[in-house]
Amino acid sequence: MNTSYNYHIVKSYDDELNRLVTEIIRMGEIAVAQLEAALDVVERRDDKAADRIVMNDEAIDALEQSISHDVMRLALRGPMARDLREILAGLRIPADIERIGDYAANVAKRSIALNTMPPLPQTASLRALGQLSAQAVRNSLLSYSNKDEQIATKVRENDARLDAQYTALFRELLTYMMEDTRNITPCIHLLFMAKNLERIGDHATNIAENVLFLLNGEQMLPPREKCDNTSNVNLD
């Protein structure tokens, strides 16, 4: 058996896996930058910057397509065990990142409509929720980059906190709408934006769970603690 040839085959495969992870992290960093920029334009009420964020979403979509092709090429080389889990994570994580980018673009898009109306005090609460979402995404990417089980577990646990903050903002906006019907239209935009941010947190948790799968295989995870109680809100 030509051990030198086998060594080069294995090293080439490992190098390609490492490049794949690097590309996925780069895609994630672009998505986080989009999210943080979207939160910024909501606060600054900057339509032109919001338009740029919406247009830049295409770059994330293109990266996902490119990464998907790379993953398929690696899969054809017959990965085993841990490498197969790397391949599966390489398919799943970019899909979550792509959705994060979509939700960030949606926040920016709705900010343009919101800018035609007087500013609302709840914008500050929306930003706080968005910062939690952005931190969740950053930490999930860090757990993937470093293969860190502890960070991934923490992201999963913190999703309940994000849900609770979303529910609090949901209540706040409903109350504000009931106090004055003129608040209904802008509050509805903020409700949709808040839901986008809550879903970003869910996708960050998906990434963290894929890291745990990558590290531990098919080990059963406990059910996520969910604190999104918006369906049970009673304002009577």
UniProtKB/Swiss-Prot annotation:
UniProt family annotation: Belongs to the PhoU family.
Compartments, as annotated in UniProt: Cytoplasm
Biological source species: Xylella fastidiosa (strain 9a5c)
PANTHER family, per the entry: PHOSPHATE-SPECIFIC TRANSPORT SYSTEM ACCESSORY PROTEIN PHOU (PTHR42930:SF3)
Keywords, in A-Z order: Cytoplasm, Phosphate transport, Transport
GO molecular function, one term: protein homodimerization activity
Main location, first listed in the record: cytoplasm
SUPFAM superfamilies: PhoU-like
NCBIfam families: phoU_full (TIGR02135)
Function: Plays a role in the regulation of phosphate uptake.
Oligomeric and partner information: Homodimer.
Pfam family, one: PhoU
Name of the protein in its database record: Phosphate-specific transport system accessory protein PhoU homolog
GO cellular component, one term: cytoplasm
A single GO BP: negative regulation of phosphate transmembrane transport
